[in-house]
Amino acid sequence: MANVYDWFEERLEIQALAEDVTSKYVPPHVNIFYCLGGITLVCFLIQFATGFAMTFYYRPTVTEAFSSVEYIMNEVNFGWLIRSIHRWSASMMVLMMILHVFRVYLTGGFKKPRELTWVSGVILAVITVSFGVTGYSLPWDQVGYWAVKIVSGVPEAIPVVGVLISDLLRGGSSVGQATLTRYYSAHTFVLPWLIAVFMLFHFLMIRKQGISGPL
């Protein structure tokens, strides 16, 4: 076993990396409220795992979406638990994100030289809300359908480009199969990649600049 570790150590310098991670200075003013961002990340990882599990059974069609969710809840082993954890974790992620934003704002974490960290955080907040909007529609029940109809119709109030944006969100002039396909694609592919990229940038900035000092 030691030989295997030595082989990886020689090539990856695992010990040096571990020392760099564990020896990072933590200011004395840091308290439990500074963990809100990390809790948000944990919620996202739970979302990713449970969401990935449900993709094995969910069918993104207007005729089968609701019945596939019922199948997950009633027939799949622990399916009810996986979907419930996905829903609870989604709510917790949004709550933790909001509290994290308030903490950063109230402690001045957005000030120079951390402007880019703040901007990337705001983008992450928008992506998180987008996860909620797209995921809410996937069961394609009455609540999800009318939520999509309302949300996709809001941009129509924008002059000149409003109708174009709404048609882009719906995949046409009305809510239907194209809409569900787009929301499913966004929820399971586009948004996860976007949030991964901005999370990486966000964490690299925090790693580079450290935690902001007390007010």
UniProtKB/Swiss-Prot annotation:
It is found in: Cellular thylakoid membrane. This is Cytochrome b6. Its main location: membrane. The chain crosses the membrane at residues 32-52, 90-110, 116-136, 186-206. Heme b 1 binds at residues 100, 202. One of its GO terms (molecular function) is electron transporter, transferring electrons within cytochrome b6/f complex of photosystem II activity. Coiled coil: none annotated. Keywords: Electron transport, Heme, Iron, Membrane, Metal-binding, Photosynthesis, Thylakoid, Transmembrane, Transmembrane helix, Transport.
